Amino acid sequence: MEQTLSIIKPDAVAKNVVGKIIDRFESNGLKVAAAKRLQLSRADAEQFYAVHKERPFFKDLVDFMVSGPVVAMVLEGENAVLKNRDLMGATDPKKAAPGTIRADFADSIDANAVHGSDSLENAKIEIAFFFSGREIN
């Protein structure tokens, strides 16, 4: 069964829509195999998003991700990576299709409610960043 990482970002946690977002995943065939609420340190956020280090938005992204708690989850199901990305919608909520998580819960391209792995290979790396094998079931 395929697994992917989802992070509910500080903006969505602050709005108390964590349960609504998890319901979207579960009602679309994705099981929450592991979950934890945590506060990312600046070092953690910089390491997690290191692939974007040279991009102009990197500092703002890190600042945002450490601005409040997040909920990291391992989602499991058939085609989990693609299904999660479809449910999230476009990175910019203004361009996200109606009924997607970002269209319904995100405010801007920066405060866009959720992160999801973009490939199976990256999902494995991202899951290992947050979870040990014994935490996933």
Swiss-Prot record:
The active site is at residue 115. It catalyses: a 2'-deoxyribonucleoside 5'-diphosphate + ATP = a 2'-deoxyribonucleoside 5'-triphosphate + ADP; a ribonucleoside 5'-diphosphate + ATP = a ribonucleoside 5'-triphosphate + ADP. GO terms for molecular function: ATP binding; metal ion binding; nucleoside diphosphate kinase activity. SUPFAM superfamilies: Nucleoside diphosphate kinase, NDK. ATP binds at residues 9, 57, 85, 91, 102, 112. InterPro entries: NDK-like_dom (IPR034907), NDK-like_dom_sf (IPR036850), Nucleoside_diP_kinase (IPR001564), Nucleoside_diP_kinase_AS (IPR023005). One of its GO terms (cellular component) is cytoplasm. The keyword Manganese does not apply. Belongs to the NDK family. Major role in the synthesis of nucleoside triphosphates other than ATP. The ATP gamma phosphate is transferred to the NDP beta phosphate via a ping-pong mechanism, using a phosphorylated active-site intermediate. This is Nucleoside diphosphate kinase. It comes from Wolinella succinogenes (strain ATCC 29543 / DSM 1740 / CCUG 13145 / JCM 31913 / LMG 7466 / NCTC 11488 / FDC 602W).
